[in-house]
């Protein structure tokens, strides 16, 4: 697969460094965030979070024209969803905490509006078992004109995979490039596409 344009949904502690690393390899990266302040800050070549070396990579990537940010999703070859998945409030002390996937669902809706045949969608957010399949279901509901791996397997129009972030604040720029990655695709083709994408900088 050719990944000329990569979109990262969610420009926080994982999404922004990920965007910057792809852009540093001279890939066109479109970062998407709901915060206009975040978007404006990044487009001015600055950062809104504290992370060593990130400001230098972002500034160069923006100045070189490889990184831009927006509040609305735009067409791309690959989409990485890196939004928060906080725990929902527990009802009582015996309840098991459950993750809130509403941000993922909102990101899916945003991506679905510009999705096209051949695209790859990766969930990077820390998520529970079954979340990647759920994401594929949500995408299919939004785009019945496209086929997805949970129904069409290897022949699907869209590739879907999971690659959870595995970095520690303070060392993100180094770890995002050096740490081993665990990639799980809904099919072999999905996994292969995700591996090819991350090989750009890992």
What name fits each language-model region?
Residues 15-16:
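N-terminal Rossmann-fold NAD(P) dinucleotide-binding loop
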Residues 11-12:
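Glycine-rich Rossmann-fold phosphate-binding loop(s) that bind the pyrophosphate
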């Amino acid at each position: 697969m050719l990944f000329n344009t990569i979109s990262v949904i969610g420009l926080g502690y994982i999404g922004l460094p990920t965007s910057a690393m792809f852009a540093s390899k001279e890939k066109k990266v479109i970062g998407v965030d709901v915060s206009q302040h975040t978007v404006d800050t990044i487009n001015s070549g600055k950062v809104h979070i504290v992370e060593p070396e990130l400001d230098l990579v972002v500034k160069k990537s923006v100045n070189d024209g490889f990184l831009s940010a927006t509040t609305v999703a735009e067409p791309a070859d690959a989409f990485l969803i890196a939004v928060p998945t906080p725990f929902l409030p527990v009802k009582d002390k015996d309840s098991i905490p459950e993750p809130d996937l509403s941000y993922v669902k909102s990101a899916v809706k945003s991506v679905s509006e510009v999705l096209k045949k051949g695209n790859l969608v990766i969930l990077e957010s820390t998520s529970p078992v079954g979340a990647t399949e759920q994401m594929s279901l949500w995408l299919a509901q939004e785009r019945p004109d496209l086929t997805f791996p949970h129904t069409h397997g290897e022949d699907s129009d869209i590739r879907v995979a999971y690659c959870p972030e595995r970095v520690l604040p303070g060392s993100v720029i180094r770890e995002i490039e050096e740490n081993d990655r665990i990639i799980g695709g809904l099919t072999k083709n999905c996994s292969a596409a995700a591996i090819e994408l991350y090989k750009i900088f890992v």
